[in-house]
Design a protein with these regions (language model features):
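Glycine/proline-rich low-complexity spacer/linker segments in large multi-domain proteins
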Residues: 1, 151-187
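Aromatic (Trp/Tyr) and acidic
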Residues: 1-110, 114, 118, 130
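A generic structural signal for beta-strand entry/edge sites
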Residues: 89-91, 132-134, 144-146, 170
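Short, glycine- and charge-enriched coil/turn segments that flank and shape catalytic ligand pockets
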Residues: 99-103, 122-131, 143, 187
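C-terminal beta-strand-rich structural cap/linker in extracellular carbohydrate-active enzymes
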Residues: 104-107, 137-152, 156, 183
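Solvent-exposed beta-strand/loop surfaces of large extracellular or lumenal domains
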Residues: 114-138, 157-163
Length: 187
């Protein structure tokens, strides 16, 4: 089920097409299927699993949020601290606390919108291997190692797909993952 977006509704089309009879041309005060409150509670309970995850011998960071996470990796307790003002700032600082040196791959997510990024490990440029949206950094990690990830966020214009009739000629202005809204009265 998708809620109706009143900014995209053509009232005449809803009235003439029986298949669209359920589509309301104005925002409803309440929906009979109130799924937001329980989904929000579920999100808070599971947010840690969205930030980082482990698969085989690789530790992944998927979301960039100021946080401290503790987990067991390769049978050892490790701590990962992240400082970030993402998505408003391009730089993400990550530090690792390890009980001893450990060799493994640490994979950081590079969003599809990001065409230019760079990584410093302990102040030195690191290339890594980009695969399936993650930059893999394989090395012997030591306690106190610092990773600085910079995701370049130039302002860009994203044009709508011309095959979507209702969106022909429409564009969005974006910076990083943020899509800016310009409503009808402002355009």
């Amino acid at each position: 089920f998708f809620y109706v977006n009143p900014l995209e509704v053509v009232p005449e089309a809803c009235q003439k097409d029986q298949r669209k009879k359920h589509v309301k041309p104005i925002r409803q005060k309440w929906f009979a299927c109130a799924c937001c409150p329980p989904n929000l509670a579920r999100l808070f309970a599971s947010i840690g699993g969205y930030l980082h995850f482990i698969r085989a011998e690789t530790l992944y960071t998927n979301l960039y949020v100021t946080s401290t996470s503790e987990f067991t990796f390769q049978g050892l307790p490790i701590k990962l601290h992240m400082d970030s003002a993402y998505p408003f700032d391009e730089k993400i600082h990550i530090s690792l606390s390890l009980p001893r040196p450990m060799e493994f791959s640490y994979a950081v997510r590079i969003p599809a919108w990001c065409a230019d990024y760079h990584v410093l490990i302990n102040g030195k440029i690191c290339a890594g291997t980009l695969k399936d949206g993650f930059l893999y950094l394989h090395r012997c990690w030591r306690d106190g190692d610092e990773v600085e990830l910079t995701l370049s966020m130039p302002v860009r214009v994203v044009r709508a797909n011309s095959l979507v009739r209702e969106n022909i000629g429409k564009s969005a202005i974006c910076r990083g993952p943020i899509v800016y809204c310009m409503e009808q009265t402002d355009n």
